[in-house]
Amino acid sequence: SLVKSDQICIGYHANNSTEQVDTIMEKNVTVTHAQDILEKTHNGKLCDLDGVKPLILRDCSVAGWLLGNPMCDEFINVPEWSYIVEKASPANDLCYPGDFNDYEELKHLLSRINHFEKIQIIPKSSWSNHEASSGVSSACPYLGKSSFFRNVVWLIKKNSAYPTIKRSYNNTNQEDLLVLWGIHHPNDAAEQTKLYQNPTTYISVGTSTLNQRLVPKIATRSKVNGQSGRMEFFWTILKPNDAINFESNGNFIAPEYAYKIVKKGDSAIMKSELEYGNCNTKCQTPMGAINSSMPFHNIHPLTIGECPKYVKSNRLVLATGLRNTPQRERRRKKRGLFGAIAGFIEGGWQGMVDGWYGYHHSNEQGSGYAADKESTQKAIDGVTNKVNSIIDKMNTQFEAVGREFNNLERRIENLNKKMEDGFLDVWTYNAELLVLMENERTLDFHDSNVKNLYDKVRLQLRDNAKELGNGCFEFYHKCDNECMESVKNGTYDYPQYSEEARLNREEISGVKLESMGTYQILSIYSTVASSLTLAIMVAGLSLWMCSNGSLQ
């Protein structure tokens, strides 16, 4: 008699996950496990960067801070900073109207500086032949009175005379020195002589690398901050052991303080309206701080610190698990690009919870699920290494800081913006393509592992079992739990069971042959009987026609 068939099936894990990923071939594929690699959240605050506070200029501009706008006194001396924060339109800029020459270049310089030390280079009290305290303006008020920038001195004539100035400062420090000075452009000739006595004046400035001669531009202008005059400010970096020489007979705004560059490093000037949040981060954006190990973010293109790369994507999810198709969903799923299972396993097993791939067996001793730990662990290691590799390759830290251009450089600014947008488009495309390709490969990798497990069993059992076409094998012999375990661990003894399997195969084949013979006899009998009946009917019809004279 036939044995009651024992079976072993190969299958894969399924769960209640609703995580979905995209691949080259499909969109919204539900998977058992996935990992988001796009950071989309921030804390909405300005934070310390690696424990170092930012310099938040509040309502002051960089120019207002460096020149010493009286409304920026809180920044007279500042400690080391990690980055500088300036509002888009700070109220306290150049209180006396005018320009800051090469301002954008100075800001770029500041993006590589972390600390200034302010030092006095020409004391205000040293101008004995000129008025050093009368140079104030209602445009720069302080406590309701006229005042002026704290770090420079507006020199006015004294006793109806403005003697020619010849001053030098030698940088004996070991550090570079940021030196600032300026020129006043009066509204008319009357103001020129009223302030400086001399109708024709100049300012000469020289270092080992600088040769500058300035003359005032006297012109009638509209009033700004109540002033028709204008001031123009300049700066230079004075190297150690170099000297800066000033010569002027009027309109000179002399330096009193300079900035010793005591620490250089990665910094940035960030445009933001946020407040300080008393927090710490490794990555700061104008929108807020990011604390993430993900390789990509879509928060803001400008960052400072150890930051993910900015992309324009809204979703980047890597598949780490398998297609999630529980067995109750009997629909055939599309397969991937790189091979994979030929569709013979209709669904995953939610009952197998301790591995990605495994077995289900049934015999006289019962039935149950068992994960294949070895193939599962290899797959976990492989997928984990791949995800970590992607993150490591993409998570090369860098700063993406904004560049500023003056009004004469708008065409350059537009070109720069187009180039940066182009780079962002390329990065976004690369990131999205990478995710699509890797997801396709991961799902096919899992499918291939299931197929390999199936082949491992098939090669062991050979003709001792029958392939049922659904991922299962039906044994031609009794297979108890010990036998089942040997199939799972690859030690199945084919010769031990081959004789029993052969006999059962032959018995099954004999039943098929016997059944086939019976069907053939019945078929012949039926054919003969039908033929005899037809012959009798034809003969009877002929006799009837003859008796009626109808047959000629």
UniProtKB/Swiss-Prot annotation:
Disulfide cross-links: C9-C472, C47-C279, C60-C72, C95-C140, C283-C307, C479-C483
Record PTM text: Palmitoylated. In natural infection, inactive HA is matured into HA1 and HA2 outside the cell by one or more trypsin-like, arginine-specific endoprotease secreted by the bronchial epithelial cells. One identified protease that may be involved in this process is secreted in lungs by club cells.
Primary localisation category: virion
UniProt KW keywords: Clathrin- and caveolin-independent endocytosis of virus by host, Clathrin-mediated endocytosis of virus by host, Disulfide bond, Fusion of virus membrane with host endosomal membrane, Fusion of virus membrane with host membrane, Glycoprotein, Hemagglutinin, Host cell membrane, Host membrane, Host-virus interaction, Lipoprotein, Membrane, Palmitate, Transmembrane, Transmembrane helix, Viral attachment to host cell, Viral envelope protein, Viral penetration into host cytoplasm, Virion, Virus endocytosis by host, Virus entry into host cell
Molecular function terms from GO: host cell surface receptor binding
Pfam families: Hemagglutinin
Other known facts: Major glycoprotein, comprises over 80% of the envelope proteins present in virus particle.
Reported function: Binds to sialic acid-containing receptors on the cell surface, bringing about the attachment of the virus particle to the cell. This attachment induces virion internalization either through clathrin-dependent endocytosis or through clathrin- and caveolin-independent pathway. Plays a major role in the determination of host range restriction and virulence. Class I viral fusion protein. Responsible for penetration of the virus into the cell cytoplasm by mediating the fusion of the membrane of the endocytosed virus particle with the endosomal membrane.
Name the UniProt record assigns to this protein: Hemagglutinin
Organism: Influenza A virus (strain A/Chicken/Hong Kong/YU562/2001 H5N1 genotype B)
Gene name, Swiss-Prot/TrEMBL: HA
